């Protein structure tokens, strides 16, 4: 008796071991869309549950049938085959004939009947007579119409009929969606609670007028406008649905809380241009009920120290039109340049409809300096203007698409304070483009020109120097310019630089980069310098951290290789 039971026990143990061995699935017979949907349904099953047992096969069949039903296939044939000694469960699927839409009856009534957005959503839904049934398209359209109604102020909208009927034996499906939107509400009076700023200033940030059709995007824009002023620590804009008076005007309620009167910020940084750097910032986001503000910053590094203070006076268009008065004091001790620069400027800012930011300014510059063999004090009054535009689309803190253009022209005359007649032109452009998820291109061009009667009377801050982390990699910071009779750097009348960089995603937020930089700072004829190399980028919350290994091809032997490290925005 015992001898007979041993083989039975041994077989049972083998069967149990096979049942718990790791099993993989092979599914064939399905086209890509069907295969993808089946995979999505099966993703809820942990691989540890995979088995060749009949119970698991039944579970698997149920999920596959549900996945195929969702795309209109109600007559699938599913066969299972255990292969490779129980290590593979093969699933052979014949999806069968597809169920098609025999009737598509979609009707919008109410004030949204001729609304182009509703018409567009319906036309793009994919629900058309004769097309294969897709439950996802039906569910998506149903929720899209409801969401669109809420976004556009049809708050009383309701479905009169919403049915999807399937006759599997006929391979036919019938869609009935009848939606009554009701009336469309309009923006009514707006009330503001908690504001310390003048009522008219706050009202100017409202992107809609009383009586305009309701749009949730306008509510979001209003919220963003209020936040962008930095006057408030919290902002909440919402329709006051509890105070409807039976008409179509929807009261709006704005709740804000004042920002702190003083904000302080400290920071430590490092770049190979200036070495370790410490910063301190003090800001008063609002000074009075008219929304005036004050900001100041102090930065110290070994070659450069500066302090700035600015006072901002917003105008009727609070965010885009304002006056700014700024004073800055900067000390430089770098290579052959020692200077103490004092700048006082008055600026008028506008944003034009095309997205360009326009600034008209006049600045008063006094600079005491030693530049090579020159030792002097210069003063200039420089009126001018700047046009700039920045466009960007972000994925987190990484710019996936963007560009920036800046042009500045300023003029000084020896008939009014300035040491010599000078016209200065500065221009720059940067472009970022992304291909797919793993490829980025970064392109930069920049330059400047001094059209001057007596170049020797220009202080260092008005001359050009090239080289450094953000200019010409492979060369030291501001190490490129013509030299004077003593061999010291003298600064240049002109400068032109450019850069081409390709980046490839290595993993997650890590990117590799290869680049070529070129340019020169010169007086008459450029002698182009080239820097090339490779680097690593890490996308941090405050912008990309960049580590580059660069070779300056025209550098002196022994000085051609340089490491560049920097952190900050790419545009």
What are these regions (language model features)?
Residues 16-19:
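N-terminal signal peptide c-region/cleavage motif recognized by signal peptidases
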Residues 21-33, 43-272, 281, 295-313, ...:
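Periplasmic polypeptide-binding modules associated with outer-membrane biogenesis and secretion
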Residues 108, 194-196, 314-315, 340-345, ...:
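Flexible, surface-exposed loop regions and adjacent strand-edge segments
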Residues 117, 215-406, 441-443, 470-474, ...:
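Gram-negative/organellar outer-membrane beta-barrel architecture
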Residues 526-534, 538-540, 548-551:
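Strand-loop-strand
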């Amino acid at each position: 008796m015992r001898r007979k039971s041993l083989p039975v026990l041994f077989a049972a143990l083998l069967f149990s071991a096979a049942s718990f061995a790791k099993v993989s699935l092979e599914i064939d017979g399905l086209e890509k869309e069907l295969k993808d949907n089946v995979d999505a349904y099966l993703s809820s099953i942990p691989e540890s549950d995979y088995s060749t047992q009949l119970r698991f096969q039944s579970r698997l069949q149920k999920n596959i049938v549900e996945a195929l039903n969702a795309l209109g296939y109600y007559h699938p044939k599913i066969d299972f085959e255990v292969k490779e000694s129980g290590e593979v469960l093969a699933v052979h699927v014949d999806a069968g004939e597809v169920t098609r839409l025999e009737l598509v009856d979609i009707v919008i009534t109410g004030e949204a009947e001729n609304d182009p957005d509703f018409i567009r959503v319906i036309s793009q839904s994919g629900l058309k007579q004769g097309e294969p049934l897709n439950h996802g398209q039906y569910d998506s359209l149903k929720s899209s119409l409801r969401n669109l109604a809420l976004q556009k102020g049809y708050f009383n909208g309701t479905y009169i009929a919403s049915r999807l009927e399937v006759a599997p034996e006929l391979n036919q499906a019938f869609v009935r969606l009848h939606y009554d939107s009701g009336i469309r509400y309009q923006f009514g009076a707006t009330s503001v609670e908690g504001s310390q700023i003048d009522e008219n200033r706050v009202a100017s940030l409202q992107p809609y007028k009383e009586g305009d059709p309701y749009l949730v995007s306008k509510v979001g824009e209003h919220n963003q406008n209020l936040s962008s002023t930095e006057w408030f620590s919290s902002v909440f804009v919402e329709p006051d649905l509890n105070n409807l008076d039976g008409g179509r005007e929807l009261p709006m309620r704005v709740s804000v809380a004042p920002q702190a009167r003083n904000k302080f910020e400290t920071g430590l940084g490092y770049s190979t241009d200036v070495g370790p750097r410490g910063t301190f910032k003090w800001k008063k986001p609002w000074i009075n009920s008219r929304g005036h503000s004050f900001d100041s910053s102090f930065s110290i590094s070994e070659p450069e120290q500066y302090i700035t203070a600015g006072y901002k006076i917003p105008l009727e268009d609070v965010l885009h039109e304002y006056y700014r008065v700024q004073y800055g004091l900067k000390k430089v001790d770098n290579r052959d340049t020692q200077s103490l620069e004092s700048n006082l400027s008055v600026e008028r800012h506008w944003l034009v409809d095309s997205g360009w930011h326009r600034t008209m300014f006049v600045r008063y510059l006094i600079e005491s300096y030693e530049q090579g063999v020159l030792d002097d004090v210069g003063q200039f009054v420089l009126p001018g203007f700047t046009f700039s535009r920045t466009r960007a689309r972000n994925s987190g803190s990484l710019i996936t698409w963007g560009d920036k253009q800046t042009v500045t022209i300023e003029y000084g005359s020896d008939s009014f304070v300035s040491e010599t007649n000078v016209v200065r032109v500065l221009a720059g452009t940067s472009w970022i483009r992304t291909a797919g998820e793993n490829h980025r291109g970064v392109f930069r061009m920049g330059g400047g020109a001094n059209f001057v009667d007596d170049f020797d009377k220009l202080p260092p801050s008005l001359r050009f120097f090239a080289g450094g982390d953000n200019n010409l990699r492979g060369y030291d910071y501001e190490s490129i310019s013509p030299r004077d009779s003593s061999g010291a750097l003298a600064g240049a009348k002109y400068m032109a630089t450019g850069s081409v960089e390709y980046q490839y995603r290595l993993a997650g937020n890590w990117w590799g980069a290869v680049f070529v930089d070129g340019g020169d700072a010169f007086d008459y004829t450029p002698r182009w310098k080239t820097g090339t190399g490779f680097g690593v980028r890490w996308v941090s919350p405050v912008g990309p951290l960049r580590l580059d290994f660069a070779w300056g091809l025209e550098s002196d032997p022994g000085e051609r290789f340089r490491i560049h490290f920097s952190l900050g925005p790419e545009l």
